[in-house]
């Protein structure tokens, strides 16, 4: 059986490492996310499997806090006449008292990256390129593991993607991925795994199998969502009530019918939220667009049908895009 790939997610404090892992794992409960720095204090792991076969192990690591001081310390570890390479220097550091005291969090990160097949270096693309980030990359490079930079938070207007691209290239890191964990692109995960496969050729079969399975799951979710909406429309269209002709009875029956439709719609909304791994608190549904209980247009008018057809087509396209985006975000 093929061994699962081990992937460490590393980076500065508060750059979205845990949020990225939640996206890749489709598990909103993984880890702890907060605006406070250094939220993650220990290494946490999770495994992605397909048909019971483990394919990828992902490890969330604490944020790097003082890479500048750590790099200075590492550069003083060589004894007279020694020229240690990166991994040997880190082994000596991890055996030192400083790794258990002053640089305890950094030591956890380096141990995990050295025990992994590769690392994802998560970057908050809204931040300027500072010396501390260059020193972080210099320290991580000593592990001797492939490192793929991931530009996070690239959807906003304040992102600095191009300066980061240039800075990474100057450090010899020419492959990178733009992957916003809040609003991930539709092809974000396949591109991330494809880029990883270029750095880690032996892991290509596992990564491709993950991509194929996720695409199959996305199609199944889409079909299940379409069925839920179709069942809602059929149930509402088939809803009939016989009432007396008195005005009071008609008003009461109309209100009761509206309430039944709202309840049926709400059940559909809740089922869709569960399908895409949202909770009820994540979305607020408005009432159906009715005017005095009736559609404003004659549904059988050819012009109305034409307009509805255009709107429906646009809505389906928008819904498909939104559905895929949600799928990438939370499952």
Predicted feature residues:
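Internal hydrophobic scaffold segments of catalytic domains
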Residues: 37-74, 191-195, 200-202, 251-273
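Conserved C-terminal guanine-recognition region of P-loop GTPase G domains, centered on the G4
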Residues: 53, 74-176
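Membrane-proximal, non-transmembrane alpha-helical segments
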Residues: 252-311
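Conserved G1/Walker A P-loop phosphate-binding module
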Residues: 1-93
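Membrane-inserting effector segments that mediate pore formation, membrane fusion
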Residues: 303-331
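Alpha-helical transmembrane helix bundles of large polytopic membrane transport and channel proteins
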Residues: 203-259
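Canonical P-loop GTPase G-domain recognition
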Residues: 153-223
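Conserved nucleotide-binding/hydrolysis micro-motifs of P-loop NTPases
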Residues: 39, 63-65, 126-128, 154-158, ...
